[in-house]
Curated annotation (Swiss-Prot):
The lineage of its organism: Bacteria, Bacillati, Bacillota, Bacilli, Bacillales. NDH-1 is composed of 14 different subunits. Subunits NuoA, H, J, K, L, M, N constitute the membrane sector of the complex. It comes from the Bacteria. It comes from Geobacillus kaustophilus (strain HTA426). This is NADH-quinone oxidoreductase subunit N. NDH-1 shuttles electrons from NADH, via FMN and iron-sulfur (Fe-S) centers, to quinones in the respiratory chain. The immediate electron acceptor for the enzyme in this species is believed to be a menaquinone. Couples the redox reaction to proton translocation (for every two electrons transferred, four hydrogen ions are translocated across the cytoplasmic membrane), and thus conserves the redox energy in a proton gradient.
Length: 497
C-alpha cells in the first residue's frame, strides 16, 4: 500500500485533468437551472481536453516509466496515442457545443461529461500495462459510449442505436474476457510484461492460439471490422452527430491502441506450433490478412449504395479500419509509426467532415445526401472544406490521406511477398472509394440546391472545421511535420516492456 501512495502521480496529469473537469462539469450541470444553456460546459470540456493535450506534450521528453506496480505505463506509445485521443476528444466536444437536435437539448450537460468519461477510459487504455486496467478502461469507454448513443431519449433511432451498441458491446466484452481468462490461466499473472515473459516458456500452443483468436474477435467488434461490423452503420446513423464523430475517431483510435498494446505485447514472442514461424503473432498473420481484405472490400462496396451521410461515413470507416488492420497484418516497428500517422490524419479529416454534417443535420433535420446539393453556391467555404476532407479520405495524391495510405501500402509491399495480394486489395478498394467520395463532391459543386440555404456555421463548428482543415493541409503538403513528431516519440522504441 505504501508503494501505491509513493508513486509519482504526476505521470497521470492528463488523466487527472480530464477526470477533474468531468466531475466539475457534472456538479455544474446539476447546479444550473434546467432552462440555462449548457453550451459553456462543452467549451469548458474542450478547453480541459486541450489542457490535457498540452500536459501530454510536456511529458514527451521524459523517458518511459510506470507506476502502480506496472499497471500504468507512460511510454512513447502511450503519449503518442493520448495525443490523438485528446485532439479527437477536444474537437468532438466543439461539435457538442453546437448540437441542436429537433427534440431540443435538455440532456446536453450529460453529453459533455459522459464524453469526458469516455475519453478518460480511452486514455487509460493507451497506458495500461495490465489486463485488469485494460479491461476496466475498456468498460469505462464502452459504458460511457452506450449512454452517448442513446442521449436523444425521445428519438426511436437513438434508442435503437444504444440498444444495438449495448448488445454487441456486451458480446465483444464477454469474448474478450474469455480470452483474457485463458491468458491468465496459462501464465498466472495479469501483468502484460509478465505474461509475455511466461508465454515464451509455455508448451500449450493451441490454447495460446485460442486465446489470441478470442482477444482478436473481441477487439474486432470494437473496431467494427468484418464480420463483426454490422452494428456500426445503425449506431452511427441513430446516435447524435457529435457522438458519431466521437465513436468514429476516439473509439477507433483507442481500439487500435488496445490491439497493439494487448496483442503485440503479449504474443510477439509467444511460441506457436512448429518451428516456422516461431512467433504466434506471425503464425496468425494469414487470418488477420483475410479479415483486413474482407473489411476493405465490404466497407468500400456497401458504401456505394448509401444515401445517409452518416451511414456512408460508417461504411467508409469500416473500409479505413481494414486499411489499418492491413498495417497490423504486416506488423513491424516502422508500421507502428505508419498506423499512428494514419490515425492522426483520420481524426482530422473525419472530425472535419462530421462537423459540416452536424451543421447540415441541425439546419435541415436530415442527413440525406441531397442536403449537400449546391452547397458551394451559398456556402463556398463549407463546400471547399468538405471537399478537402473527402479528397483526403479518398487518398488523392497531394492530401494527408494519400501520405498516410502510402506509408501502409509501402509497408505491405516491402515486408514479404505474401502481402502483395493485400496491397492489391488496398489499391483496388481505394479506387472503389473514389466513386462515393466523388459522388459527394459532385453534389457539393455541380447539383442544384433542393433545400433552403444553410445558416452561418456556429463558432464551435467553425473552429473544428478550420483546425481540421489546417491540420489536413499541413500534413498533406509538409508531411515532415508528422515525421518530426514521430521522432519526438522516439519511434516507439520503448513500446515492449
Amino acid at each position: 500500500m505504501n508503494d501505491v501512495w509513493q508513486s509519482d502521480w504526476s505521470m497521470m496529469a492528463p488523466e487527472w485533468i480530464v477526470l477533474a473537469a468531468a466531475i466539475a462539469l457534472l456538479v455544474m450541470d446539476l447546479a444550473l437551472p434546467s432552462d440555462r444553456s449548457r453550451r459553456p460546459l462543452a467549451w469548458g470540456a474542450a478547453a480541459a481536453a486541450a489542457l490535457a493535450m498540452i500536459a501530454t506534450a510536456a511529458m514527451i521528453p521524459a523517458g518511459s516509466a510506470s507506476i502502480l506496480h506496472d499497471t500504468f505505463r507512460l511510454d512513447a506509445f502511450a503519449k503518442a496515442f493520448k495525443f490523438i485521443l485528446l485532439a479527437g476528444g477536444a474537437l468532438a466536444l466543439l461539435l457538442v457545443a453546437e448540437w441542436a437536435p429537433k427534440e431540443g437539448s435538455p440532456h446536453r450537460g450529460e453529453f459533455v461529461y459522459m464524453m469526458l468519461f469516455a475519453l478518460l477510459g480511452a486514455m487509460m487504455m493507451a497506458s495500461s500495462g495490465d489486463l485488469l486496467t485494460l479491461f476496466v478502461s475498456l468498460e469505462l469507454l464502452s459504458v460511457s459510449s452506450y449512454i452517448l448513443a442513446g442521449l436523444r431519449k425521445t428519438a426511436p433511432a437513438s434508442n435503437e442505436a444504444a440498444l444495438k451498441y449495448v448488445i454487441n458491446g456486451g458480446i465483444a466484452t464477454a469474448i474478450m474476457l474469455f480470452g483474457m481468462s485463458y491468458v491468465f490461466g496459462l501464465t498466472g499473472t495479469t501483468n502484460l510484461g509478465g505474461i509475455a515473459r511466461r508465454l515464451q516458456e509455455t508448451n500449450e500452443p493451441y490454447m495460446l492460439a485460442l486465446a489470441f483468436l478470442l482477444l482478436l474477435i473481441g477487439v474486432s467488434f470494437k473496431l467494427a471490422t468484418v464480420p463483426f461490423h454490422m452494428w456500426a452503420p445503425d449506431v452511427y446513423e441513430g446516435a447524435p452527430v457529435p457522438a458519431t464523430a466521437f465513436f468514429a475517431v476516439v473509439s477507433k483510435t483507442a481500439g487500435f491502441a488496445l490491439l497493439l498494446r494487448l496483442l503485440v505485447t503479449i504474443f510477439a514472442a509467444a511460441p506457436s506450433e512448429g518451428r516456422d514461424p516461431s512467433s504466434l503473432l506471425l503464425s496468425m498473420q494469414p487470418i488477420i490478412t483475410v479479415l483486413a481484405g474482407l473489411t476493405m472490400i465490404i466497407g468500400s462496396v456497401v458504401a456505394l449504395r448509401q444515401r445517409s451521410l452518416k451511414r456512408l461515413l460508417a461504411y467508409s470507416g469500416i473500409a479505413h479500419a481494414g486499411y489499418l488492420l492491413a498495417g497490423f497484418a504486416a506488423m513491424s516497428w516502422a508500421m507502428i509509426d505508419s498506423l499512428w500517422m494514419y490515425l492522426l490524419v483520420y481524426t482530422l479529416m473525419n472530425i472535419g467532415a462530421f462537423a459540416i454534417i452536424a451543421h447540415i443535420v441541425n439546419e435541415t433535420g436530415s442527413d440525406d445526401l441531397d442536403g449537400l446539393a449546391g452547397l458551394y453556391r451559398h456556402r463556398p467555404f463549407l463546400a471547399a472544406a468538405l471537399g478537402l476532407f473527402l479528397l483526403s479520405l479518398a487518398g488523392i495524391p497531394g492530401t494527408a490521406g494519400f501520405i498516410a495510405k502510402l506509408h501502409i501500402f509501402i509497408g505491405l509491399v516491402v515486408t514479404e511477398p505474401g502481402h502483395y495480394v493485400l496491397a492489391a486489395v488496398m489499391a483496388i478498394t481505394t479506387v472503389i472509394s473514389y466513386v462515393y467520395y466523388f459522388n459527394l463532391i459532385v453534389q457539393l459543386f455541380f447539383r442544384p440546391t433542393f433545400t433552403a440555404p444553410l445558416g452561418r456555421l456556429p463558432a464551435g463548428l467553425s473552429t473544428a472545421v478550420v483546425l481540421c482543415a489546417l491540420g489536413t493541409l499541413a500534413i498533406g503538403w509538409a508531411p515532415g511535420l508528422a515525421y518530426d513528431m514521430l521522432a519526438q516519440f522516439g519511434h516507439f522504441g520503448d513500446f515492449l516492456p
